[in-house]
Amino acid sequence: EKDIQVIWGYLQVGEILSAPEKQKEAWWRPHSTDERTSGTANLIFKASERLSLDNTKPGAGLLPFDKKRVLTLEGATKATWAMNEVYDTQHIYGKRKNGAKDPIKGLYYAGIWQELGLMESDACTEWARSILL
C-alpha cells in the first residue's frame, strides 16, 4: 500500500512563548536550547487547558485513525493533499506555492515542515469540528 498523510493529533494554542527567557523555562522542549532561543524566529506553542470545541477534551491530544482525517489525495503521492479551501494557499499563514500536478484537485506544499497555520474562519472551525469530534 502507498504511504499517506493523516492528521493524528491536535493542539489548540493557549500560549505562545516568544521571549528567550520564557522559552528556556520549558527546558524539556527541543526549541528551548540556546541554539534555538538565540534566534529571532523561534516560538514555542503551549496547548490550552481544554479544547474550545469540546471542553471535555484536553487542549492537545492524539487521534485514532479515521478516513476523515486522511489528507492525501486518493491515487496521488502522499504529500499531495485533497483540495480543501480551509488549507489552500489563500487560507494559511506564510507564503506557500501549490505545486500539485493538478492544482484544481490537490495541494502540494514543498519543503520540510510539520505544522500548518490555518487562518481562522467559520469554514475552518467546522472542518476542525468534523475531524476532531
Task: Name what the model sees in each region.
Residues 3-8, 15-133:
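Contiguous surface segments at macromolecular interaction interfaces
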